[in-house]
């Protein structure tokens, strides 16, 4: 297997030497043991053994120094070792990693666990993220060595457990061999302590079993003193040891030792009290002081603009720009939110907010509104949202309503729904919102649904028609063009009126034959222009009405259709019988669109068609003609000599 190599940064390695207190430069072909104290594998310590290649075979410096893996285990006890985290070593040794197979364990690569060795005590088996990076053969080798180390650790634990049990047995034996004065010899050693041993005021020696009574009679408790039954218990306790040297007065009695320390029980004499260990409590590092974070107020003000000069407009201004502020500078804490708001307001008198007022954007806006208006805006929220919708759009009104009502979906939807630009938007939004599983999901997806509906209907982000600025002029020019074509066609073909056909309706009011229908058509055109310009609606229904399920009635269009039907009946009674079928087709198209717009595409028929075929064509294609009549934007001039049966 080819040795693993990589580029070497000599300067970074020299800096690493200086950081570790090594006052020399790296040498050519120097073997270094790398001790990595944590890396991508986890907190465990891993090793690798590399050699430095600084010169070529002729002794010339290499253009790019290299390092090479030695392929043997590293032993920090006898090798020159660099100890650093894996990330720091990668600065000098490009693409360095742990050793292959069991070489990553360094001194434990052969599976020999040494009790008490510092490198053995820090051993940690591979974690999951390290195992997943191993090949099959490498994994089997690593598991074999880890198994050996684990077995040795288990054996060591068993030996230490046996030693502990032996020491406990010796302790029980020593405690059982210490009799108490005035009490019979204790029973065989047991696990429970004898309470009499601690309650006796004196401690007697422990002679051998055959001579126990004789020793007690000859030695006595004090020199020439009475027996233990006549002693005053208030006297100091004395411990006597027959193995210590005493005065040779021939009596064999031990002298009194009033200054000797008292012995309460044999257990403290065998096990001295351990000093109390201090309680170590982990203290979390203090959090980052928010005051140390620099707020990019210029970037935020470039997005939001300057604060309004009128203090009453400040709360709504903050609510409209809350999302923009979060997009420029994410705000994790209330302290930073209060600092941002105070910086945007320029420390205006009476509007400075504290962190407890800025837990959320809603609380901050509510506090500002109370300070500027004197009351919480819930009672006039509908009017506030209407003004915001007129200036910023329904999406901004929705977001502001959500913040001011603490995510009350039903309340805000009831206020925003009448602000949507038309019945089609209301119906589409209601259909999309009904498909959501909960009110929380509806709140989150409301703006996305609204933008999708606006895009579908050809509206901008504020619900206005994309052609609102040029819609009125375009319609006026189109109407004027159709009227001019009607006049030119009548002047150029005088025989068309003599054939018993009526002139076009809705464009020439001077003829006097259809005054009411023409006026109705002009009024509808004016209503369309006014509705498109003022309401900013869409092309499908310029003047919508609220359906009955939302609280409305039949609406204006039902009355207009009834009036147009009466006008059509009067106009048909004044026209010749030959005009009936063509007039019905034209008036049906006018009933669906503005009154007076004729089906002009019939003028495009060829000159060779006779009257019968023209009538049949009008009858067969009445549906298509009605659809084309709704467009009302045909600019193809009428063909000369063609039958004008429907006109």
UniProtKB/Swiss-Prot annotation:
Q: Among its keywords, does the record have DNA-binding?
A: yes
Q: Which UniProt keywords apply?
A: Capsid protein, Cytoplasmic inwards viral transport, DNA-binding, Host cytoplasm, Host nucleus, Host-virus interaction, Microtubular inwards viral transport, RNA-binding, Viral budding, Viral budding via the host ESCRT complexes, Viral nucleoprotein, Viral release from host cell, Virion, Virus entry into host cell
What positions are marked as the site Cleavage? 301-302, 329-330, 342-343, 616-617
Motif Nuclear localization signal, residue range(s) on this chain: 536-557
Q: How is it modified after translation?
A: Specific enzymatic cleavages in vivo by viral protease yield mature proteins. The protease is not cleaved off from Pol. Since cleavage efficiency is not optimal for all sites, intermediary molecules are expressed.
Q: Does the keyword DNA-binding apply?
A: yes
What Gene Ontology cellular-component terms does the record carry? host cell; host cell cytoplasm; host cell nucleus; host cytoskeleton; viral nucleocapsid
> Where are the residues of the annotated region Nucleic acid-binding?
475-500
Q: Where is this region: GR-box 3?
A: 581-613
- Could you tell me which residues belong to the region GR-box 2? 536-557
A single GO BP: viral release from host cell
| GO terms assigned for molecular function | DNA binding; RNA binding
Pfam families hit by this protein: Gag_FV_central (PF20672), Gag_spuma_C (PF20673), Gag_spuma_N (PF03276)
Q: Where is this motif: PTAP/PSAP motif?
A: 258-261
Q: Which domain of life is it from?
A: Viruses
Q: What does this protein do?
A: Involved in capsid formation and genome binding. Shortly after infection, interaction between incoming particle-associated Gag proteins and host dynein allows centrosomal targeting of the viral genome (associated to Gag), prior to nucleus translocation and integration into host genome.
Its domain description in UniProt is: Gag protein contains 3 glycine-arginine motifs (GR-boxes) necessary for RNA packaging, the first of which has nucleic acid binding properties in vitro. Late-budding domains (L domains) are short sequence motifs essential for viral particle budding. They recruit proteins of the host ESCRT machinery (Endosomal Sorting Complex Required for Transport) or ESCRT-associated proteins. Gag protein contains a PTAP/PSAP motif, which interacts with the UEV domain of TSG101.
Name of the molecule in the record = Gag polyprotein
Q: What is the lineage of its organism?
A: Viruses, Riboviria, Pararnavirae, Artverviricota, Revtraviricetes
